[in-house]
Amino acid sequence: MARTHKLEDVRNIGIAAHIDAGKTTTTERILFYTGVEHKIGEVHDGAATMDWMEQEQERGITITSAATTCEWLGKQINIIDTPGHVDFTIEVERSMRVLDGAVSVFCAVGGVQPQSETVWRQRNRYGVPSLVFVNKMDRTGADFLEVERQIRDRLKGNPLVIQLPIGAEENFEGVVDLVKMKEIVWDADAEMGSAYHEQDIRPELQEQAEAFREKLIEGISEVDGNEELMEKYMEGEELTTEEIMAGIKAATIHMHVVPMLPGTAFKNKGVQTLLDAVVHYLPSPVEAPPIKGTKMEDEDVEVVVESTDDGEFASLAFKIMTDPFVGQLTFIRVYRGSLESGSYVLNSTKEKKERVGRIMKMHAIKREEISEIYAGEIGAVVGLKNTTTGDTLCSDKDKVVLERMDFPDPVISVAVEPKTKADQEKMGIALSKLAAEDPSFRVNTDEESGQTIISGMGELHLEILVDRMKREFKVEAEVGAPQVAYRETIRKAVNKEYKYAKQSGGRGQYGHVFLKIEPQEPGFGYEFVDAVKGGVVPKEFIQPVNKGVQEAMARGIQAGYPVEDVKVTLYDGSYHDVDSSEMAFKLAGSMGFRDGCREANPVILEPMMKVEVEVPEEFMGDVIGDVAKRRGQVSGMDDRAGNKIVNAFVPLSEMFGYSTDLRSMTQGRATYAMEFDHYEEVPQNVAKEIIEKRNS
């Protein structure tokens, strides 16, 4: 099967936005106008084609980036739909990695919202050229130029207005195209916004249009590489439409400007002009910067993988999904060469061979089977066994590893218990499949309680995963409250004598020990020293004492949490020829240790998290006050891209519910990350609560 479109006629784009900016509706309209979709799905009634998992339809938010292919002006456009909720940032990171360009959707009323800041940071990190689509121009309070100001001030972006809105709110009827200097007006009586026409700019808009066109030309002629434009412009010569378009494209691809256009997807205006801009200004795989990687055999040797059809196959797996009909789908972006179904490839990240079964081109939820996939394309492969997100698949003739993505560590854990025995087995399978799909989700077993602990990026993240276990894998599970792993230790050294003696007719029990118990540095662990002189405790009874001490350590002193950082020395004792046994000395060791520790100023330790909050300056005071309320200590402050960074150490037990609290405290404009740092002593009043709770 030959290529349907030349490599330079392909566009791989993502549509990224804040939750509720209207991203899914925009994608739906794109599919409708490009002729793939016949009845438009609205998110409001939960029927959008792109939102193909049940939970997304219920919550009205997009969770998994479905990949879809469509065509406009003879170009193939592959769209990756990205989620807009903070807990799903991993999905956005993932799709940013494989895109060549992006459309950022902003709400004309809400403007720049917190998630837009996060998505914008990721876009800059991965260097993805973008357009801005200001959606919902028909809504009360819509203000296109206010959104432009916010992008400049809040996101430190460089928006380039290429179209102005004609009217706003219910009077929004079209756009002024500043490149052609024409109005584009949608016909009021045409069905679904399918007809629109060009006309001359009305007199009352002429002056504004000329001022913005001036700004547009200035904006693109200041860019390196566009010097000829600058000269013509300075000499007052008229620039041709082609020159302006080439200038916008060059400035966009080099990340100097972000072209901006208005519209309303819901009311079917401005989507066709957005598609035109995608084709004209966003890069094809050939124009996008080539992807870098390393040699599989030697990761110090860097290689550049140019986008081309000839050359050995190289691709990146960016998403794994479980499909009810075909099993596991691995979404790949091909960077070089081509791949045929039925062939073998090398997973160079894991150094394993894989056999490719079928290859699918996805259209949101419908799929088309193809026999071959080429450079620059995005498709789903069936049949891979060992490939996970971020792995490289390549030919074994040129073994490259494309750069891996960075995945954040989970920040919240809960225990899950299967409701029945039957659920137990299914739960294990379900959790391992979900973990393969989502690298920011971890599963482990708590050695102390034997419970299954799941960890993820936020409370909503875990809620949705438990919900998917129920729906897709039919596993019923009880979810516990988030848990903290405390520890215990002592603060002063003591000497303790303990005699275990039992006499009840026949053979008795006798073990007698003198222990020195000493606190040690954090992280020391445990040490047992045998300092017995003159055989007062026979050799064979020494290890049982050690074993008894360790069993007592595991049981804890005050609240039943494991004891750590102690040194125990056995320095004296006595024994009885008949009544002494290993058991007697083990019990003497464990009871002696327990009683000794109770006199050694025992304390409870809690995990301290290193927390970093990125917050706009106006909310910094609230965030710092809140850290203090959570028993945290601020360790430093910093600046980053117009925001403040607050670094602090906060007890894990005080961080539950933090993402929700932080969101409401900062109108959702702050983001945070946390990781475990060290254990620290719990204050007296908190320790008292922990002990009472454990012993009740």
Curated annotation (Swiss-Prot):
The gene is fusA. Pfam families: EF-G_D2 (PF22042), EFG_C (PF00679), EFG_III (PF14492), EFG_IV (PF03764), GTP_EFTU (PF00009). The keyword rRNA processing does not apply. It comes from the Bacteria. CDD domains: EF-G (cd01886), EFG_III (cd16262), EFG_mtEFG1_IV (cd01434), EFG_mtEFG_C (cd03713), EFG_mtEFG_II (cd04088). This is Elongation factor G. Belongs to the TRAFAC class translation factor GTPase superfamily. Classic translation factor GTPase family. EF-G/EF-2 subfamily. It comes from Sulfurovum sp. (strain NBC37-1). SMART domains: EFG_C (SM00838), EFG_IV (SM00889). One of its GO terms (cellular component) is cytoplasm. PROSITE patterns: G_TR_1 (PS00301), G_TR_2 (PS51722). One of its GO terms (biological process) is ribosome disassembly. Catalyzes the GTP-dependent ribosomal translocation step during translation elongation. During this step, the ribosome changes from the pre-translocational (PRE) to the post-translocational (POST) state as the newly formed A-site-bound peptidyl-tRNA and P-site-bound deacylated tRNA move to the P and E sites, respectively. Catalyzes the coordinated movement of the two tRNA molecules, the mRNA and conformational changes in the ribosome. It is found in: Cytoplasm. The lineage of its organism: Bacteria, Pseudomonadati, Campylobacterota, Epsilonproteobacteria, Campylobacterales. GO terms for molecular function: GTP binding; GTPase activity; translation elongation factor activity. Residues 8-286 form the tr-type G domain. HAMAP family: EF_G_EF_2_B. InterPro entries: EF-G-like_DII, EFG_II, EFG_III, EFG_III/V, EFG_IV, EFG_V, EFG_V-like, G_TR_CS. The keyword Cytoplasm applies. Keywords: Cytoplasm, Elongation factor, GTP-binding, Nucleotide-binding, Protein biosynthesis. GTP binds at residues 17-24, 81-85, 135-138.
